[in-house]
Amino acid sequence: MDGGATAGDHLVVFTPSGKRGRVPHGTTVLDAARRLGVDLDSVCGGRGICSKCQCSPGAGDFPKHGLTVGPDALSPRNAVEARYDRVRGLAADRRLGCQAIVQGDVLIDVPPESQVHRQVVRKAASDRAVTADPAVRAYVVAVEEPDMDAPSGDLERLRAALARDHGLDGLTVPLQVLTGLQGALRRGGWTVTVAVDAETGVVAAVWPGARDAALLGLAVDLGSTTIAAHLCDLSDGAVLASGGVMNPQIRFGEDLMSRVSYAMMNPGGTAEMTGAVRGALDALAGELCAEAGRDRGDVVDAAIVCNPVMHHLLLGIDPSELGQAPFALAAGDAQRLGAAELGLALAPGARAYLLPCIAGHVGADAAAVALAEAPDAADAVTLVVDVGTNAELILVDRRGLLACSSPTGPAFEGAQISAGQRAAPGAIERVRIDPDTKRARVRVIGCEAWSDEPGFDAAVTGICGSGIIEAVAEMRLAGLMDPSGLIGSAEATGCADCVPEGRTHAYRLWSDGTRDVMVTQTDVRAIQLAKSALYAGARLLMDEAGVDAVDRVTLAGAFGAHISPVHAMVLGMIPDAPLDRVGSAGNAAGHGARMALCDRGARTRVEALVRRIRKVETAVAPRFQEHFVAANAIPHASDPFPHLGPLPRVAFGAGGGGGRRRRR
């Protein structure tokens, strides 16, 4: 039992924040959220009127959280919830937090619409141009009217007209399209516009008359933490709307292996996670169409990139085999499907293209990054790092391409950090520590001013991933932390903001006089574990390639776009390289998805590229653990970082004292 718990206490874990604690039996979910500092909205005073506090309780085993949730963990729906359901509708898996009472250990997911400070999904579309040669194109065709003397079906005459006028033979017309064919022909006066997928010969939609409106497509980056999508005009590749949401599968586990475990341990777990992610993706598609002022039926194609576990769960495939050697994919090649098979309500016969996966732990998202960045065209040894809960790395030299994945976990995204949170307004995202005064200044999402500048009036709510990376690196640069990651005492560092915390010390990053945001020793250890996994993966690829250094490092992914290269190198997340050759590619996976959506040639290229990439499996590589241990030091126990210059030579004892100079 957690410290301070009593027999009447129950453990409550909230996702996606990861906050947890024990509350007394009979506490409402809303009160539990407030007690634990969780963002659960409510504006009606807990009367069950506003619905802002809707939440989704989990059920089953959650080994990641050390939790088993029984069917009676929450009280049954009461009269207030029943009334709300009758009047406004309440989804079967939703509860009103102000009415649901905690009766046992429980996991509660707070959906984006119920969060006071919603996460900022920072995956904007790239402004890079794409070639417009889409797989799905529109054809206008005049169809002969029916004739009693030469009876034939409308479909047969449509096929004949398409073959005659456009050379399109052997087309497949899905039932969803066929059901609307006769109405379209008659409303259009026997002239219709037909959307055809050139790759599969499938008709995606039929509209009456000669249609002028452009066909639309959806480029999707389906990550384990966030889902980002771009609604594109297929005629020129222009992005009409972009958006993102949290992946609702977070409630089943923040990292991929937790979701694999959930599928293995809970009957129906795969279907549950599949339904959650399909529902979120479909809702996001609807939001983007509404934002662009276009109809869902205008969307005729989608290109989707994702890691192997998300790939399997989107397809409804049990991911259990990905949790054990040899990590076999059910299918690694590109998949061409009907969008409706993935739960997407778009054009009746809309298509979906899933980019190929590289191997069991390196997915289509890494393939999309390789497509977008074309590192194989460079004349330098290039390391591409897609930073996330499951980092994926690609190393390219003149001899070929190597790829691996590293299980960094969610610490880089603010999870498992004492004051950590997802990226949302109020989260500290930038940190600078004066090496002389040892005092920190911060900048938060939603406010351009630094904390020591006029105009800084933001309410600081916590620290997100880019903030904790900069905080730990700045502590090392300021001499508040030694190479082992140990935080020094106030006496050893000369900094009053280094305060005792149990047997170790913590650093006060920010305070408003009533609340402190601290960086604790446990926080530093979490970042060390994450960065060590990332660096070890890079070193493993370098070993395989027979190189001791890289010429260029590209940080990909939405999170990579917000990481400072110098802080990443100080921390030892990436190998040493010239700082002017360490840069961000932004959401490269999303751009790769957009390329595959708008250009058939890009699909051919990525499928050929994947066949050339050699996979290195970190889970069974003998030297991975060796590299991991050496990378625990900040920046590294033995690898040189000449481009950084000297770091403070400090060493603190087990209690953070000392401060003796260490010879180099």
What are these regions (language model features)?
Residues 39-105:
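Local cysteine-cluster metal-coordination motifs and their immediate loop/turn environment
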Residues 220-224, 229-257, 320-334, 368, ...:
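Glycine-rich phosphate-binding loop of actin/hexokinase-like ATP-binding domains
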